[in-house]
Amino acid sequence: MESTLGSDLARLVRVWRALIDHRLKPLELTQTHWVTLHNINRLPPEQSQIQLAKAIGIEQPSLVRTLDQLEEKGLITRHTCANDRRAKRIKLTEQSSPIIEQVDGVICSTRKEILGGISPDEIELLSGLIDKLERNIIQLQSK
């Protein structure tokens, strides 16, 4: 019998993301916005778009649309790097701080609800298995 593990994991990611999007809708943000803001917030100040894209694990053109949306909402600013006029530096605005706090609260409470009824040992086991799968895939990609 063929394993459906890959499909099962993909479906889990889809429904998890859909729930996050639903919960963030009152803030007029999406899971993609949160991931971007979260990474900008945790990285050293004024990262370039290239550095941010690498940290998130996406291509730079995919990131630009999200950054445009966050800039329109007044949550980030972008300015040209003094050393490299082609590069843009990203900075959170003062307005973003309370929003990031709200979003983090939504994400944290949603995560707790999703993981409800699952023991810490089970979560640790699952995380370990996911790490193993990721390492196997990375190793296969490098061949």
UniProtKB/Swiss-Prot annotation:
The keyword Repressor applies. HAMAP family: HTH_type_SlyA. Residues 2-135 form the HTH marR-type domain. Residues 49-72 bind DNA. GO terms for biological process: response to stress. Homodimer. GO terms for molecular function: DNA binding; DNA-binding transcription factor activity. Coiled coil: none annotated. The gene is slyA. Keywords: Activator, DNA-binding, Repressor, Transcription, Transcription regulation, Virulence. Belongs to the SlyA family. This is Transcriptional regulator SlyA. SMART domains: HTH_MARR (SM00347). Gene3D superfamilies: Winged helix-like DNA-binding domain superfamily/Winged helix DNA-binding domain (1.10.10.10). Pfam families: MarR. Transcription regulator that can specifically activate or repress expression of target genes. Required for expression of the virulence gene inv. Important for the regulation of genes that influence the early stages of infection that occur in the Peyer plaque. InterPro entries: HTH_MarR-typ, MarR/SlyA-like, Tscrpt_reg_MarR-type_CS, Tscrpt_reg_SlyA, WH-like_DNA-bd_sf, WH_DNA-bd_sf.
